[in-house]
Amino acid sequence: MTAPTLTDLTDRAREIFRLVVEGYIASGHPVGSKALAGHGSVNLSPASIRSVLQELQDAGLLAAPHTSAGRMPTEFGLRLFVDGIMQVAEPSAAERAQIERGLVAGGTIESALAAASTALSELSAGAAVVMVPKREPRLVQISFVPLSPLRALAVLVSEDGGIENRVIDLPEPVGPSALEQAGNYLTSRLHGRTLGEAAGVVRAEIAGGRSALDEASADLVQRGLVVWTQDATARPVMVVRGQANLLDETALQDIERVRQLLEELEGAEAIARVLDAAREAQATRIFIGSENRLFSLSGSSVIASPWRDGDGRVVGVVGVIGPTRLNYARVVPMVDFTAQTLGKFIGQDGFSRK
């Protein structure tokens, strides 16, 4: 059987379908024929409405969770509604101001992500997530500090004033002179570069015997590079807010689904893969239920949009995660506005990139 399109529906079937979807999104409960008969746009008897509802169910657009409980949209029905019927409502001036409020010059990227995700979760009644790839800073100095005979602390100082510490395990004791030699060598090679830019050069010099380092210092440098490069490829900076919004009255009727969703939200790396799909998009993307593998078990939806810097390059993703009955018409433009606002504020002068 060929999947139906909106053009396959009669005007009355289309109107009843719209009312069922909008009623379900608003209440979280199936919509029955008596409720539909009360709408002025439906001039049909309850019996005639039930007949149309059955047709929509047979077409795969609606489902009946219980015999007398009314109808609710299927994932396929929601997709048809979102793509062909939904009319978006732009954020109000108050909503735009709430999103912009926490994004102030002189803040940090982390504070901006937290502010944006908090505002978006409050406005959307879902869980909001904002992601930006971890930025690799340019370095100005590297030094090694002894902690114990078999451990050393590597201290990295970046151009923006940031300081990062990493503990390195040593196979055998290393003296102060070897620590100093390794630090001086790395500082001379990495100064003004990112670790990724210089790591290959350093490794090639050591492998080719061109580093002028003794064996202990060369081993220390190699171990430091392993620790730092592993960290540099770690998961991106991500902020999730509003998980409690998922625990509303209707959601608690299906506590197993909520438990599954909250468990899925703990997988930052998995969420990052979901949001990466939106990075390639030119506009906001909507994943409904099983359209996205990560959230297919909990039957949840994701609305995500890439955000860009002043040069138009995609630098992050912002999104809302929630039940399939998200208010798409309201949340889609809200996510889009948040993405635009993040790009504008984080690209402005005076915004710290630490």
Swiss-Prot record:
Species: Novosphingobium aromaticivorans (strain ATCC 700278 / DSM 12444 / CCUG 56034 / CIP 105152 / NBRC 16084 / F199)
Task performed by this protein: Negative regulator of class I heat shock genes (grpE-dnaK-dnaJ and groELS operons). Prevents heat-shock induction of these operons.
Family listed: Belongs to the HrcA family.
The protein's name: Heat-inducible transcription repressor HrcA
Pfam family, one: HrcA
Positions of disulphide bridges: none
Keyword terms, alphabetized: Repressor, Stress response, Transcription, Transcription regulation
One Gene Ontology molecular-function label: DNA binding
Keyword Transcription regulation: yes
Single GO biological process annotation from the record: negative regulation of DNA-templated transcription
InterPro entries with a match to the protein in the record: GAF-like_dom_sf (IPR029016), HrcA (IPR002571), HrcA_C (IPR021153), WH-like_DNA-bd_sf (IPR036388), WH_DNA-bd_sf (IPR036390), WHTH_transcript_rep_HrcA_IDD (IPR023120)
Superkingdom as given in the UniProt entry: Bacteria
Repressor listed as a keyword: yes
